[in-house]
């Protein structure tokens, strides 16, 4: 009984009024905290989802599956939620980068217009293919005729060298040592075999075949790239703005009031920047989403990330 009395004396405060006041103060503070908590959750109902998405984005941004053409990490052991978070994060980054490129190009066009710089080559930012012929520019659809003329000139030159120039140098000038006719005569073979030099013929035929094959490959590459381009914007990624007729400015029309007996000159028309294209004169192509490709998708089998 004495120990029970000690426990009761220790458990309860000696003053009942102080105990009631402290209990009321504690309950009021807990109620206030609950009301504040409910208020914050009502103001921001998506706080939990945002926190989860931000944590998922942080995890996805720090994880790199493909660091280069030779280093690809194994992601087969990832959980399903991790895979979904990484897909969502990377898709969002793709569209954000595309929007940044679109705005940067619009701003670049505005700056070029203000400075009076007109460069049409920047409008066609398509990949160029290096030529197999030295000292020639990269192969595009514009200079394809130049490549045709160059290849035909090389083939004609090789044929003329093997058919006319080489026999003349060999027979009349004695360049090249023993002629092929003397070699055939020394072996007591029919002289009809000496009418064609196999060395010159093989050199000429091989050169013509190699140049023709390479030219066919280059032409096929150009045609394939043309098929990959968007059919609406022709690979530029942008279309002409229909509101300002690709000028970037709108003419403000004001009503003109005629005053009897008055000769007043009309005020010059006022212009303002087009709000549809932001003064660039071009808008985003809705088909390719500024990529210039015929199909913009991660499922496109024609897109090689290591090309």
From Swiss-Prot:
One of its GO terms (biological process) is protein stabilization. Disruption phenotype: Increased expression levels of ELIP1 and ELIP2, especially upon illumination. Reduced cotyledons greening in deetiolated seedlings. Induction: Decreased levels upon illumination, in both nucleus and plastids. Induced by TCP14. The keyword Nucleotide-binding does not apply. It is found in: Plastid, Chloroplast membrane; Nucleus; Cytoplasm. Ubiquitination at K-58 by UBC19 is essential for nuclear localization. There is a cross-link at residue 58 (Glycyl lysine isopeptide (Lys-Gly) (interchain with G-Cter in ubiquitin)). CXXCXGXG motif repeats lie at residues 230-237, 274-281. Its sequence is related to the DnaJ family but lacks the J domain. The CR-type-like region is similar to CR-type zinc-fingers. This is Protein ORANGE, chloroplastic. The gene is OR.
């Amino acid at each position: 009984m004495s120990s029970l009395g000690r426990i009761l004396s220790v458990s309860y405060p000696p003053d009942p009024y102080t105990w009631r006041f402290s209990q009321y103060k504690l309950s009021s503070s807990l109620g206030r905290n609950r009301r504040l908590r409910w208020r914050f959750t009502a103001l921001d109902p998506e706080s939990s989802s945002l926190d989860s998405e931000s944590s998922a984005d942080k995890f996805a941004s720090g994880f790199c599956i493909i660091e280069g053409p030779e280093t690809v990490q194994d992601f087969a052991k990832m959980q399903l939620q991790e895979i979904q978070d990484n897909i969502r994060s990377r898709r969002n980054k793709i569209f954000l980068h595309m929007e940044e490129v679109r705005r940067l190009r619009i701003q670049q066009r505005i700056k070029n217009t203000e400075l009076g710089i007109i460069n049409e080559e920047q409008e066609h930012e398509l990949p160029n293919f290096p030529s197999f012929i030295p000292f020639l520019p990269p192969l595009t659809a514009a200079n394809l005729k130049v490549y045709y003329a160059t290849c035909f000139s090389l083939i004609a030159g090789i044929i003329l060298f093997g058919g006319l120039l080489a026999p003349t140098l060999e027979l009349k000038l004695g360049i090249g040592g023993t002629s092929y006719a003397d070699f055939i005569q020394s072996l007591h073979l029919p002289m009809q075999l000496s009418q064609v030099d196999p060395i010159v013929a093989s050199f000429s035929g091989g050169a013509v075949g190699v140049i023709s094959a390479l030219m066919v490959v280059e032409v096929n590459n150009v045609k394939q790239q043309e098929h990959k381009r968007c059919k609406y914007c022709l690979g530029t990624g942008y279309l002409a703005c229909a509101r300002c007729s690709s000028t970037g400015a709108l003419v403000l029309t004001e009503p003109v009031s005629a005053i009897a007996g008055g000769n007043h000159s009309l005020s010059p028309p006022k212009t303002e920047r087009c709000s549809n294209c932001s003064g660039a004169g071009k808008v985003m192509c809705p088909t390719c989403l500024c990529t210039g490709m015929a199909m913009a998708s991660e499922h496109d089998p024609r897109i090689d990330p290591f090309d």
